[in-house]
Curated annotation (Swiss-Prot):
The gene is TMEM121. May play a role in MAPK signaling. It is found in: Membrane. It comes from Homo sapiens (Human). The keyword Cell cycle does not apply. Residues 277-306 have a biased composition (Pro residues). One of its GO terms (cellular component) is membrane. This is Transmembrane protein 121.
Length: 319
């Protein structure tokens, strides 16, 4: 498959979000260390950023080239690479906060770190999907349905980031070490996998995308985010008396459970009541428009020098 020319605005915006968030994470890592250790950390993060930028230089261009197509393969690669590197840096920042090193007592810096992640991570996902660049999604209803499903993905990402932020925002932690590690790496795994599942559903549907048939991500997020997040927060409140539990996101997960249950029931009813050809009508491409201009009349050939006259019509003879 030959990709079209890359969208320069999309490439620049994606690179700006990725490298901007990486630069802020590097600033946190350097600021949390002091003395000769700071110089070593600065050298390490600079070398890592140069290597990451070399890889990003090619992957971001490929993502910008496929943004107007129905495929999102390079977008999944870029997302996996970004979250993999970002969460490694975030883990060391989290460990430095636990060790109460320099700058760890500043609550504003912790809140700013959470704000940075909550803007850049869901924002990059929506950039990689690039719904506004999908010119093959022509109907307004289908576009808004797809936008609503992508909004649920962004909410799940915010939910996972909130669970991670509850580990470093308070000055003291009430959870044991094993519970903190389990929470961090569970969210890390879901941040890697779940957006790639959503992007793969968009890519597998192709140009004749049907949002009502994209059921893999809702099932996975229902089990891994909505149910597990409610149980984990309830266990933290009941067992460890953790006051950092977000009641707002608990309510969000309860609403998501009810909404997705209704969606699954409606989908089963549609499959049962309508035959497969009726469901596949929406997948058919629109018929090509015919040219409304009538063809020109054929020329009348006659001897030169005489005007072209229409031959008189003859009445049929009655026999």
């Amino acid at each position: 498959m030959v990709l079209p020319p890359p969208d320069r605005r999309h490439v620049c915006l994606t690179t700006l979000v990725i490298m901007g968030s990486m630069a802020v994470m590097d600033a946190y890592l350097v600021e949390q260390n002091q003395g000769p250790r700071k110089i070593g950390v600065c050298i390490i993060v600079l070398v890592g950023d140069v290597c990451f930028l070399l890889v990003l230089r090619y992957v971001a261009v490929w993502v910008g080239a496929e943004v107007r197509t129905a495929k999102r393969g390079y977008a999944m690669i870029l997302w996996f690479l970004y979250i993999f590197v970002l969460e490694i840096k975030l883990y060391f920042i989290f460990q430095n906060y636990k060790a109460a090193r320099r700058g760890a007592a500043d609550p504003v810096a912790r809140k700013a770190l959470t704000l940075l992640l909550s803007v850049c991570v869901p924002g990059l996902f929506l950039l990689l999907v690039a719904l506004d660049r999908m010119e093959y999604v022509r109907t307004f209803r289908k576009r808004e349905d797809l936008r609503g499903r992508l909004f649920w993905v962004a909410l799940d990402l915010l939910d996972l980031l909130d669970m991670q932020a509850s580990l470093w925002e308070p000055p003291r932690s009430g959870l044991p070490l094993w519970a903190e590690g389990l929470t961090f790496f569970y969210c890390y795994m879901l941040l890697l996998v779940l957006p790639c599942v959503a992007l793969s559903e968009v890519s597998m549907q192709g140009e004749h995308i049907a949002p009502q048939k994209m059921m893999l991500y809702p099932v996975l997020s229902l089990a891994t985010v909505n149910v597990v997040a409610v149980l984990a927060r309830a266990a933290n409140m009941a067992l460890f008396r953790d006051s950092r539990v977000s009641a707002i996101f608990v309510g969000k997960n309860v609403v998501a459970l009810a909404t997705k249950a209704c969606t699954f029931l409606e989908y089963r009813r549609q499959v049962r009541d309508f035959p497969p050809p009726a469901l596949s009508l929406e997948l058919q491409p629109p018929p090509p428009q015919r040219n409304s201009v009538p063809p020109p009349p054929p020329p009348l050939h006659g001897p030169p020098g005489r005007p072209h006259m229409s031959s008189p019509t003859r009445d049929p003879l009655d026999t």
